[in-house]
Amino acid sequence: MIQKFTNLYVTDNSGAIAVRVFQTYPGNRKIVPVGSIVRHSVKKIHRILPWGKQLRGRRKRIICRSQCGRSWIVQTSYQIPYIDGATLRFSKNRVLLVKRKRGIRIYRGRRIYGLTTRAVNNERTINLFRICI
């Protein structure tokens, strides 16, 4: 369960390490579960060069600190109950960074680290697993 001002870790190779939530969707909900979209602000990044410049000829866009965007909740430290009685709990809250282009989700990273739950494996996420194979 994630709410506003929660610090989350990024589980893809987009360049960000930690983000903070400032908006949940839909907007009238205080707490959102796994599989939801939230708005975030990047708090910590991998430093590529010490002065923060981009390498010459590098095509991939670098994520900057305090950059805002959408992210998709993949893991939470809150227990997720299943019908058969099992519960699933992760050690950290993790997200994937997402950008929308003409109504289609495009993921910033090309690789996912760690596990995902059953809640995020649906027809809307086929694009994600196609990219990561």
Swiss-Prot record:
It comes from the Eukaryota. Pfam families: Ribosomal_L14. Keywords: Hydrogenosome, Ribonucleoprotein, Ribosomal protein. GO terms for biological process: translation. One of its GO terms (molecular function) is structural constituent of ribosome. Gene3D superfamilies: Ribosomal protein L14 (2.40.150.20). Signal peptide: none annotated. It is found in: Hydrogenosome. SMART domains: Ribosomal_L14. GO terms for cellular component: hydrogenosome; ribonucleoprotein complex; ribosome. The keyword Ribonucleoprotein applies. Probably part of the large ribosomal subunit. Belongs to the universal ribosomal protein uL14 family. This is Large ribosomal subunit protein uL14m.
